[in-house]
């Protein structure tokens, strides 16, 4: 009888422990870290923006952390896949947290450019090269997949690769060697400091959402660090990406479709801030009529881009916006349409409102306002006015701290002495 009672007590205790263990497991916060490839998603057939959406929908998190600085969040444009994830979150009533962080007191890339010219770098780079050549994990990776440069150049590796063990083990070893040789500094863009600061923001999101499902989207080179840090937290259940496979196909919302196709990020910006309206539309125009080289050589802008830009501006105007930025863009489009007198008329309407243009972008708006006006005057045979506009452009470059060598080569060139013609830029 006593043995029977003892057995009952023992079984009860075992069941109790199992129940407690199961309850504790259920109350853990599930966290999945997803490595992304930033601009690479735009033309990677195996890791597209749609794949980002499929990953989000398959995991269906309660909370989404995105690699956007808090100061930029819902106010300025940032990494496209992070904005897509934000829009997905807002469209589906998810909490979205910005978790990016950068050191603002120094320019690590400028530091690195100077440092790689020193003798100290030459010595340490040889040490780093030796460590890489003798690292079995890194060499096995290169034999299997090729160099990292070739991987990024070909841009065909999929989401399983960037979220798999081989890639993340390689990145871990790469940063371990870099920090061992150079320290946590400009050569690795202060990666340890940045990752630690980002983890602080991630931990805030976790603390405010205990027991929930959280997805962290971050550049693929951060994933190894976050996985290691999160695996050490008792209240966190780190989710393996492989458990999501195969992914579901998620139908995008109209906001996401509009953003992927036309860069019009509706649903992302905080529209209670009236200035966000201008940011929404102006950012949509950037890839259309202000892409690489387009402002310096407008002849490379496709006609289809101009057509799309006209549509964006028309919608912007329907918001009853009277912003100087809108008028700047309208004048630029008129110039692209070869309506030079129309462009001059619009430009002159904001000559006394240039201070209303975004101060952080005066180096662009003010400088190109005068340069573009000079173009229009030259195209309408008003040479004296054109020269004055180019002089104002040069003056603005100096005042706003634009590199004068760059300005002379790409912006105002020699237009004070040689009139601008559309043909010369072809």
Residue ranges, per PLM feature:
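TPR-repeat structural position
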Residues: 299, 303-306, 340, 383
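Residue-level recognition of tetratricopeptide repeat
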Residues: 332, 368-371, 375-378
């Amino acid at each position: 009888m006593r043995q029977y009672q003892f057995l009952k007590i023992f079984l009860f205790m075992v069941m109790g422990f199992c129940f407690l263990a199961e309850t504790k497991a259920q109350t853990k916060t599930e966290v999945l870290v997803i490595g992304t490839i930033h601009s690479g998603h735009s033309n990677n057939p195996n890791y597209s923006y749609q794949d980002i959406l499929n990953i989000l929908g398959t995991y269906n998190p309660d909370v989404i952390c995105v690699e956007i600085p808090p100061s930029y969040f819902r106010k300025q444009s940032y990494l496209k896949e992070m904005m897509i994830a934000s829009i997905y979150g807002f469209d589906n009533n998810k909490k979205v947290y910005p978790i990016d962080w950068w050191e603002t007191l120094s320019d690590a890339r400028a530091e690195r450019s100077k440092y790689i010219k020193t003798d100290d770098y030459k010595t340490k780079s040889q040490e780093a090269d030796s460590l890489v050549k003798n690292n079995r994990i890194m060499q096995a990776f290169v034999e299997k997949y090729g160099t990292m440069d070739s991987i990024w150049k070909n841009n065909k590796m999929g989401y399983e690769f960037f979220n798999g063990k081989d890639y993340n083990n390689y990145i871990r070893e790469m940063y371990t060697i870099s920090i061992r040789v150079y320290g946590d500094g400009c050569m690795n863009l202060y990666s340890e400091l940045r990752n630690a600061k980002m983890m602080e923001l991630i931990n805030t999101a976790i603390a405010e959402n205990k027991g929930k499902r959280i997805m962290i989207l971050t550049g693929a080179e951060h994933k190894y660090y976050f996985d290691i840090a999160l695996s050490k937290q008792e209240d966190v259940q780190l989710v393996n990406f492989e458990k999501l496979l195969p992914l579901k196909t998620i139908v995008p919302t109209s906001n996401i479709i509009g953003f992927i196709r036309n860069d019009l990020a509706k649903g992302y910006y905080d529209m209670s801030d009236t200035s966000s309206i201008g940011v929404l539309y102006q950012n949509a125009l950037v890839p259309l009529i202000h892409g690489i080289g387009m402002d310096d050589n407008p002849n490379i802008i496709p006609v289809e881009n101009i057509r799309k830009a006209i549509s964006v501006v028309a919608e912007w105007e329907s918001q009853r916006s009277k912003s100087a930025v809108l008028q700047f863009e309208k004048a630029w489009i008129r110039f692209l349409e070869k309506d030079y007198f129309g462009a001059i008329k619009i430009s002159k309407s904001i000559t006394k409102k240039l201070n209303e243009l975004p101060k952080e972008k005066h180096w662009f708006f003010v400088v190109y306002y005068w340069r573009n006006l000079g173009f229009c005057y030259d195209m309408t045979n008003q040479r004296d006015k054109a020269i004055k506009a180019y002089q104002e452009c040069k003056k603005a470059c100096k005042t706003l701290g634009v590199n004068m060598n760059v300005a002379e080569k790409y912006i105002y060139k020699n237009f004070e002495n040689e009139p601008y013609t559309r043909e010369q830029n072809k």
